[in-house]
């Protein structure tokens, strides 16, 4: 059985490039782009399946996963630092509920694999900035950083307790050539 991949948050800086690359590897029909917003001339819509999705709508998320028989989820939806600070409750709800829903999908065996990016925002200002070790002081000072640190712990927990295959990378501030810097840079 070929993998079917759902990319949540596909209209963002990373998502747009990721969907294009995944479609070149897995085939256009095997990579479902999803986002809360959709541009009318969006290449993601023209090149393969697109599902409008507010990732905080757990029922709709489950419906999409079942409809396409999704095997992998790339969860990129998040409220980043600059936009999260004035919207603390929304940021926490979006950043944590979405991860919880996707982890539960894997725990319940609907999907096989999760990719969820973390961020250097987990460190905060007290972390050594030169040759930062993997295991070090983590004192995030933004709601985004706090949610990413909590998310890392949840991913570890689900992996250890339920054998969920979840992978993550701590991204630095990213700037792409196709999009303007947004809420995180």
Feature map (PLM): residue ranges:
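N-terminal Rossmann NAD(P)H-binding glycine-rich loop of SDR-like oxidoreductase domains
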Residues: 4-25
